[in-house]
From Swiss-Prot:
Quaternary structure and interacting proteins, as annotated: PSII is composed of 1 copy each of membrane proteins PsbA, PsbB, PsbC, PsbD, PsbE, PsbF, PsbH, PsbI, PsbJ, PsbK, PsbL, PsbM, PsbT, PsbX, PsbY, PsbZ, Psb30/Ycf12, at least 3 peripheral proteins of the oxygen-evolving complex and a large number of cofactors. It forms dimeric complexes.
Positions of post-translational N-acetylthreonine modification: T3
Positions with a binding annotation for [CaMn4O5] cluster: E355
Gene name as annotated: psbC
Protein's job: One of the components of the core complex of photosystem II (PSII). It binds chlorophyll and helps catalyze the primary light-induced photochemical processes of PSII. PSII is a light-driven water:plastoquinone oxidoreductase, using light energy to abstract electrons from H(2)O, generating O(2) and a proton gradient subsequently used for ATP formation.
Propeptide section residues: 1-2
Membrane-traversing stretches: 57-81, 122-143, 166-188, 243-263, 279-300, 435-459
Xref: Pfam families: PSII
The keyword Acetylation is annotated on this UniProt entry: yes
Organism, as annotated: Platanus occidentalis (Sycamore)
Positions of modified residues (Phosphothreonine): T3
InterPro entries, sorted: PS_antenna-like (IPR000932), PS_II_antenna-like_sf (IPR036001), PSII_PsbC (IPR005869), PSII_PsbC_sf (IPR044900)
Cofactor binding remark: Binds multiple chlorophylls and provides some of the ligands for the Ca-4Mn-5O cluster of the oxygen-evolving complex. It may also provide a ligand for a Cl- that is required for oxygen evolution. PSII binds additional chlorophylls, carotenoids and specific lipids.
Protein name: Photosystem II CP43 reaction center protein
Top-level taxonomy: Eukaryota, Viridiplantae, Streptophyta, Embryophyta, Tracheophyta
Record keywords: Acetylation, Chlorophyll, Chloroplast, Chromophore, Manganese, Membrane, Metal-binding, Phosphoprotein, Photosynthesis, Photosystem II, Plastid, Thylakoid, Transmembrane, Transmembrane helix
Length: 461
């Protein structure tokens, strides 16, 4: 028995019996038409780049320099600012022209890609194998597939090195840890030690460790891009020059749908990692542009009230809270001094406005009494009222914070969207992997419904 609604439907001379695909799987037409598939990919790239350029110009047109970026619903300008364009000390925007240039360059690029996509989809050769053998391929050709993989890896490596070049030679990048509250600087002293760079990969993902998401200085981030770019380029050269070994030929499925499933799996992993990075990391995603992280807003609230009550005469070192623990300060299980109250669970936050007040054993009481600077108070009060919480129609911020501002943080947008997209890509990976494996094993029509277990079970009622 087939699971079709209408197996006899024929569209454009195709039907399900002869092609193995239903009418709604339109992309299946392109599986063996490398020229048309190229057109679809180039046109898709054009749409992506058009969105980037148009959205970029939209954000520039709506941007108000007097308000922080994270209060304005911006998701592209913070990325440009993080790369050091248009900003000065403290993350203040001093020039929006670079943002305008970025938008226009992307729009022009999208026109070129759009023309190429339409050309290859409608006018160019249906298949590339005959006229352009270098660009042609057959999905089963394992050697050609690993060559294409190698070319992609080299392009990714070049992309990683573009960030390195920007940080080292072309004006530098924004460093939220620069003294006095952040600034654009060139990265001079790269971290290239493999024990440091790969040490991040070996860390636990949990509190106080945080795997690669715990990276908190730009030297490590840019050094990591040197390593990653080098590995991608060397791996790319390797895959271009070699043929797959016997174990790889046996272990992997070599079909277009299998490659689709591998790609979806990889993108899913990227999405989940990006979600954690933008939610927790305030070095790669500086709080000046993206707003504070959740832990940062919570710790900022504790710090703000510590400052207030200390001015009013409270002894913040010994005041007891309603639970019998310290009201403002307490000790973590391992002995360091941390903020007390509900924010104790965020004890492992590191932020540029707070670190100067730490000593060798956590927060330093004498520094808290004598060394708090006005910029630290201002920044923590600002972050306290801008927690990345709240849904689209709610007042953003901590529910108990009466001064919270009505906004939705770009951290919420970016973390949520990447989690959801990562999840859907993962489901797509499972779906296409299952289909590809079934096709390779020769039973792509699904399980035989005549002998399904449910048929021999008693009715539920």
């Amino acid at each position: 028995m087939e699971t079709l609604f209408n197996g006899t439907l024929a569209l454009a001379g195709r039907d399900q019996e002869t092609t193995g695909f239903a009418w709604w799987a339109g992309n299946a037409r392109l599986i063996n038409l490398s020229g048309k598939l190229l057109g679809a990919h180039v046109a898709h790239a054009g749409l992506i780049v058009f969105w980037a350029g148009a959205m970029n110009l939209f954000e520039v047109a709506h941007f108000v320099p007097e308000k922080p970026m994270y209060e304005q619903g911006l998701i592209l300008l913070p990325h440009l600012a993080t790369l050091g364009w248009g900003v000065g000390p403290g993350g203040e925007v001093i020039d929006t022209f670079p943002y305008f240039v970025s938008g226009v360059l992307h729009l022009i690029s999208s026109a070129v890609l759009g023309f190429g996509g339409i050309y290859h989809a409608l006018l160019g050769p249906e298949t590339l194998e005959e006229s352009f053998p270098f660009f042609g391929y057959v999905w089963k050709d394992r050697n050609k597939m690993t060559t294409i993989l190698g070319i992609h890896l080299i392009l990714l490596g070049i992309g990683a090195f573009l960030l390195v070049l920007k940080a080292l030679y072309f004006g530098g990048v924004y460093d939220t840890w620069a003294p006095g509250g952040g600034d654009v600087r060139k990265i001079t002293n790269l971290t290239l030690s493999p024990s440091v760079i790969f040490g991040y990969l070996l860390k636990s993902p949990f509190g106080g460790e945080g795997w690669i998401v715990s990276v908190d200085d730009l030297e490590d981030i840019i050094g990591g891009h040197v390593w990653l770019g080098s590995i991608c380029i060397l791996g790319g050269i390797w895959h271009i020059l070699t043929k797959p070994f016997a174990w790889a030929r046996r272990a992997l499925v070599w079909s277009g749908e299998a490659y689709l499933s591998y790609s979806l799996g990889a993108l899913s992993v990227f999405g989940f990692i990006a979600c954690c990075f933008v939610w927790f990391n305030n070095t790669a995603y500086p709080s000046e542009f993206y707003g504070p992280t959740g832990p940062e807003a919570s710790q900022a609230q504790a710090f703000t009230f510590l400052v207030r009550d200390q001015r009013l005469g409270a002894n913040v070192g010994s005041a007891q809270g309603p639970t019998g623990l310290g009201k403002y300060l307490m000790r973590s299980p391992t002995g360091e001094v941390i903020f007390g109250g509900e924010t104790m669970r965020f004890w492992d936050l590191r932020a540029p406005w707070l670190e100067p007040l730490r000593g060798p054993n956590g927060l330093d009481l004498s520094r808290l009494k004598k060394d708090i600077q006005p910029w630290q108070e201002r920044r923590s009060a600002e972050y306290m009222t801008h927690a990345p919480l709240g849904s689209l129609n709610s007042v953003g911020g901590v529910a108990t914070e009466i001064n919270a501002v009505n906004y939705v943080s770009p951290r919420s947008w970016l973390a949520t969207s990447h989690f959801v997209l990562g999840f859907f890509l993962f489901v797509g990976h499972l779906w296409h992997a299952g289909r590809a494996r079934a096709a390779a094993a020769g039973f792509e029509k699904g399980i035989d419904r005549d002998f399904e277990p449910v048929l021999s079970m008693t009715p539920l009622n």
